[in-house]
Swiss-Prot record:
The UniProt record lists the keyword Glycoprotein: no
Signal peptide feature range: none
GN (gene name): leuS
GO annotation terms (biological process): leucyl-tRNA aminoacylation
Protein name as annotated: Leucine--tRNA ligase
CDD domains: Anticodon_Ia_Leu_BEm, LeuRS_core
Listed EC numbers: 6.1.1.4
Subcellular location(s) per record: Cytoplasm
Principal location class: cytoplasm
UniProt motif 'KMSKS' region: location: 579-583
Reactions this protein catalyses: tRNA(Leu) + L-leucine + ATP = L-leucyl-tRNA(Leu) + AMP + diphosphate
Span(s) of short sequence motif 'HIGH' region: 41-52
InterPro entries named among the record's database cross-references: aa-tRNA-synth_I_CS, aa-tRNA-synth_Ia, Leu-tRNA-ligase, Leu_tRNA-synth_edit, M/V/L/I-tRNA-synth_anticd-bd, Methionyl/Leucyl_tRNA_Synth, Rossmann-like_a/b/a_fold, tRNAsynth_Ia_anticodon-bd
GO cellular component: cytosol
Length: 807
C-alpha cells in the first residue's frame, strides 16, 4: 500500500508558507484577537530537544484553530540569547559569544521551521540585538527614575580563584560548580530592583489570573506575606548603644523570648561582642561566609552558634536575655535577627537544648521538657497576657509594646528586592555613569542603546567587577559640558532582564521611536495563552509581572497583568521514565524523528502521549502508532496514483452523520481546554468509522482535514489540495456541528410477549405508540409466539419497548 512521503510533502508546504508569508500577522485593530505565546528558548549549543516542541505544538494548534475561527492571531518566536553558557563557552574557547549565539540561533530556527510551526518570522526578536536591548536599557532608566533601581551593599558569592561573583545556582556545597574552588560571602556594591514595593499587588492580582492553582501558590509562598509585629530589644551594654529589632508573627509569646539570635553578618555583631568572645565570633563569621543560604537554613542540619557575651532587655518582662549569633538566621530575611521562644518553636528548642539556654513555657497544653509545643492554648507566665487565647493575646501584646514605644504592628514579606547586577560580559550594559564627584546619572535616552563593546578579552577582571572593567575605551568618559571625568557602570543585567518584556516587543518589533505603539498594545494585550515549563514558575513570571506593573503605572501598557492564561506542559522523559540527559545518553533529537517519521508524526505523537501537563516517557512504539494513523488517513483519501479516492462522494447517505457531528463537537471542546490527546482519540474514532462504510461524504472528510490540520499541518495542507482546493487551509472556517445529528434518528426497541424477549426492532425515533404496536404485532417471531392466543393488552413505551400480554 502507498504511504505518504513526508520528506517531500513537508518541505513543499514549508516553502509555500515561507514564500506566501501565510502566517504574517496584520494589526487589524478592530478584529477579535488571540495572542498565543511560547516561552522563547535560550539557543544553546545542543539545539532543540524533543521537550521543546511539546509546548510549541500546543500553542501552534491553538493558533491555527483560532485563525480558522476568524481571530486575528499573534504567534511569534524569538531568542533569549544573553546568559552564562555563551560567556562560559567564550571563556573556554576564546571565541566570541556573538558568533556562538548566532550559529546556535540558526540551528534552532532551522529545526523549528522543520516542525511546521506557524510563527510570523517578521516579528522575531533577539535579546542580544542592540535595537532590542536599547529598550531593555530604556526600561531600566524608567525604573531608576521611579526610585525602583538603587545601589546597595549586598553579600554575594565571591570566588577568588575565578576572580568573579557567582550566582547561587553556580555554587554547590560552598565551592564553585566549575573547578570546585572555595566560595565566600562578601559584601559588594550591587544594583537592586525594588520589587518589594509591588509585593501586595503581585499577591492580590494573582486571584484574577487563569493560572494553575499550584503555580499561584508557588508565587504566593515566594512573596511570603505574614502579619505580626516589629519589636525592639535594648542592648544592655554601657559602651555600645543599640537596639536589636526583630519581626515576629507571634508577639504574644514575647514573655517566653529567652535569648536573641543575630545573623553572623548583622551590623551590631562587631560592636556588641565583648572582648572575651571576639575571637570565637570572628572565627564563626568566617565559617558562615562559606555557606550558601540554602545550606544555612537546612532544617536537617545540626544547629551551630556562638554567644557574643552581650545581653538585651526583654521590653515586656524586663528580663536580661543573651544575644547569640547563628548561621540559620539570614541577614537577608526580615531584620536579620530573631527573638527565640524555645518552648514554642522547634528550631529555637533544638538550639536551646544544644546550648543549655532557658526554656520558658508561655502557652499551656504541651510538655516542654520533651518538645516545643506549637499548638494553641491559654497564655501563662505572661503578665497581662495570662489567660488570653492566641488572637486576643497578639492584639494585647502589640498594644503593650506600642505603649512602651518598643514595637508596632507590621507586615513582613519573605520576598527580597531583586539583585539585578551581574559581574559578567555577556549581558546588557547598565546605562549608568558614576562621576568623580560621587554623583551618578543615567545615560541620556537619546544615546541609547549603550552598546556592549566587542572584545577578544573576555576574562574575569579579578576585582569582582565584570570583564567590561578591562576595557578602558568603554569605561572612561568625560562630560563634554563640564569636563568632569566619570566611569561607566561595568556590571551587566541578568538574563532575566530581556525576558521580562519580550512579549511586548513582538507587538511592534520594528518601532524605533518607542517600546511599542500604544494602540497596538491596547489591541493585543494581555497575552491570551502562555505555555512553558514549570521551572520558570516563580522567577521569570514574577519578574515579568513586576516590570509589567511598573509599565502600567507609567501609562505605557494598558493592562495590569501580562499573561491572562498560563499553562505548564509536562516533561517528556526517556524510555525508562528517567529524565533525558546527555550523560544518560537518552536524549532524542527531533531532527532524527523528522527524518524518519516526519514532523507531523512528531507533533501528533507528542500531543497524543497523554495530558499536556503530565510527565510521560517517550516510546518508539507510540511514535510508530502515530505514524500509522496518518498513513491510514492518507490511504483512506488518496489512491496509489495520487488521485483522490472514489470512496469520497458528494451525496450523503447519512451513515456518518452521528460520528462526524460528535467528532466536531468533541474536538472543538477539547481544543478549548488543551485536551489534545482526547481530541486525537476522537479523530481516530472517526477514521475507523470511515473504513467501515462504502462511501464517505466529502464535506465530512473536509471537516475532518480541517480538524487534523492544526495538529499535522503538512499532511493537512496536502489533503486539502487533493480535495480540489487551491488556497491554503490556514484561514478556512472551522467546522460546525448540528446538535440534532449528535443522536441517532433510529432507536432499537425490545418486544416482549408475557415478559419474555421475543424481538429487537429498529424504528424511527418519532414512531407513535399505535405504530409501535402495529410494527411489533407484524414481526414474525412475535406472530409465532401469540399464535392461537387472545391478546389481553399491549403496552408501548416510546423509544423503549412493546409488551404484549396474551393468554
Amino acid at each position: 500500500m502507498l504511504n505518504y512521503n513526508h520528506n517531500q510533502i513537508e518541505k513543499k508546504w514549508q516553502d509555500y508558507w515561507d514564500e506566501n508569508k501565510t502566517f504574517k500577522t496584520n494589526d487589524n485593530l478592530g478584529q477579535k484577537k488571540f495572542y498565543a505565546l511560547d516561552m522563547f528558548p535560550y539557543p544553546s549549543g545542543a539545539g532543540l530537544h524533543v521537550g521543546h516542541p511539546e509546548g510549541y505544538t500546543a500553542t501552534d494548534i491553538i493558533s491555527r484553530y483560532k485563525r480558522m475561527q476568524g481571530y486575528n492571531v499573534l504567534h511569534p518566536m524569538g531568542w533569549d540569547a544573553f546568559g552564562l553558557p555563551a560567556e562560559q563557552y567564550a571563556l573556554d574557547t576564546g571565541n566570541d559569544p556573538r558568533e556562538f549565539t548566532k550559529k546556535n540561533i540558526q540551528t534552532f530556527k532551522r529545526q523549528i521551521k522543520e516542525l511546521g510551526f506557524s510563527y510570523d518570522w517578521d516579528r522575531e526578536v533577539n535579546t542580544t540585538d542592540p535595537e532590542y536591548y536599547k529598550w531593555t536599557q530604556w526600561i531600566f532608566i524608567q525604573l531608576y527614575n521611579k526610585g525602583l533601581a538603587y545601589v546597595d551593599e549586598v553579600a554575594v558569592n565571591w570566588c577568588p580563584a575565578l576572580g568573579t561573583v557567582l550566582s547561587n545556582e553556580e555554587v554547590i556545597d560552598g565551592v564553585s560548580e566549575r573547578g570546585g574552588h572555595p566560595v565566600y560571602r562578601k559584601p559588594m556594591k550591587q544594583w537592586v530592583l525594588k520589587i518589594t514595593e509591588y509585593a501586595d499587588q503581585l499577591l492580590a492580582d494573582l486571584d484574577d489570573l487563569d493560572w494553575p492553582e499550584s503555580l499561584k501558590d508557588m508565587q504566593r509562598n515566594w512573596i511570603g506575606r505574614s502579619e505580626g509585629a516589629k519589636v525592639s530589644f535594648d542592648v544592655d551594654n554601657t559602651e555600645a548603644e543599640g537596639k536589636v529589632e526583630v519581626f515576629t508573627t507571634r508577639p504574644d509569646t514575647i514573655y517566653g523570648a529567652s535569648f536573641l539570635v543575630l545573623s553572623p553578618e548583622h551590623a551590631l555583631v562587631n560592636s556588641i561582642t565583648t572582648d572575651e568572645y571576639k575571637e570565637k565570633v570572628k572565627a564563626y563569621q568566617t565559617e558562615a561566609s562559606k555557606k550558601s543560604d540554602l545550606e544555612r537554613t537546612d532544617l536537617a542540619k545540626d544547629k551551630s552558634g556562638v554567644f557574643t557575651g552581650a545581653y538585651a532587655i526583654n521590653p515586656l518582662s524586663g528580663e536580661k536575655v543573651q544575644i547569640w549569633i547563628a548561621d540559620y538566621v539570614l541577614s537577608t530575611y526580615g531584620t536579620g535577627a530573631i527573638m527565640a521562644v524555645p518552648a514554642h518553636d522547634d528550631r529555637d528548642y533544638e538550639f536551646a537544648k544544644k546550648f543549655d539556654l532557658p526554656i520558658i513555657e508561655v502557652i499551656e497544653g504541651g510538655n516542654v521538657e520533651e518538645a516545643a509545643y506549637t499548638g494553641e492554648g491559654k497564655h501563662i507566665n505572661s503578665g497581662e497576657l495570662d489567660g488570653l487565647e492566641n488572637e486576643a493575646a497578639i492584639t494585647k501584646a502589640i498594644q503593650l509594646l506600642e505603649q512602651k514605644g518598643a514595637g508596632e504592628k507590621k507586615v513582613n514579606y519573605k520576598l527580597r528586592d531583586w539583585l539585578f547586577s551581574r559581574q559578567r560580559y555577556w549581558g546588557e550594559p547598565i546605562p549608568v555613569i558614576h562621576w568623580e564627584d560621587g554623583t551618578m546619572t543615567t545615560v541620556p535616552e537619546e544615546e541609547l542603546p549603550l552598546l556592549l563593546p566587542e572584545t577578544d578579552e573576555i576574562k574575569p577582571s579579578g576585582t569582582g567587577e565584570s570583564p567590561l572593567a578591562n576595557i578602558d575605551s568603554f569605561v572612561n568618559v568625560v562630560d563634554e559640558k563640564t569636563g568632569m571625568k566619570g566611569r561607566r557602570e561595568t556590571n551587566t543585567m541578568p538574563q532575566w532582564a530581556g525576558s521580562c518584556w519580550y512579549y511586548l516587543r513582538y507587538i511592534d518589533p520594528k518601532n524605533e521611536n518607542m517600546l511599542a505603539d500604544p494602540e497596538k498594545l491596547k489591541h493585543w494585550l494581555p497575552v491570551d495563552l502562555y505555555i512553558g515549563g514549570v521551572e520558570h514558575a516563580v522567577l521569570h513570571l514574577l519578574y515579568a509581572r513586576f516590570w509589567h506593573k511598573v509599565l502600567y503605572d507609567l501609562g505605557i501598557v494598558p493592562t495590569k497583568e501580562p499573561f491572562q492564561k498560563l499553562f505548564n506542559q509536562g516533561m517528556i522523559l526517556g524510555e525508562g521514565n528517567e529524565k533525558m540527559s546527555k550523560s544518560k545518553g537518552n536524549v532524542i533529537n527531533p531532527d532524527d524523528i523528522v527524518q524518519s517519521h516526519g514532523a507531523d508524526t512528531l507533533r501528533l505523537y507528542e500531543m497524543f502521549m497523554g495530558p499536556l501537563d503530565a510527565a510521560i516517557a517517550w516510546s518508539e512504539k507510540g511514535l510508530d502508532g502515530s505514524r500509522r494513523f496518518l498513513d491510514r488517513v492518507w490511504r483512506l483519501m488518496v489512491n496509489e496514483d495520487g488521485t483522490l479516492s472514489s470512496k469520497i462522494v458528494t451525496t450523503n447517505n447519512k451513515s456518518l452523520d452521528k460520528v462526524y457531528n460528535q467528532t466536531v463537537k468533541k474536538v472543538t471542546e477539547d481544543f478549548e481546554t488543551l485536551g489534545f490527546n482526547t481530541a486525537i482519540s476522537q479523530l481516530m474514532v472517526f477514521i475507523n468509522e470511515c473504513y467501515k462504510v462504502d462511501e464517505v461524504y466529502k464535506p465530512y472528510i473536509e471537516g475532518f482535514v480541517k480538524m487534523l490540520a492544526p495538529i499535522a499541518p503538512h499532511i493537512g495542507e496536502e489533503l486539502w489540495s487533493k480535495l480540489g482546493h487551491e488556497e491554503s487551509i490556514t484561514y478556512q472556517p472551522w467546522p460546525t456541528y448540528d446538535e440534532a445529528l449528535l443522536v441517532d434518528d433510529e432507536v432499537e426497541i425490545v418486544v416482549q410477549v408475557n415478559g419474555k424477549l421475543r424481538a429487537k426492532i429498529k424504528i424511527a425515533k418519532d414512531t407513535s405508540k399505535e405504530e409501535m404496536q402495529e410494527i411489533a404485532l407484524s414481526n414474525d417471531n412475535v406472530k409465532a409466539s401469540i399464535e392461537g392466543k387472545d391478546i389481553m393488552k399491549v403496552i408501548a413505551v416510546p423509544q423503549k419497548l412493546v409488551n404484549i400480554v396474551a393468554k
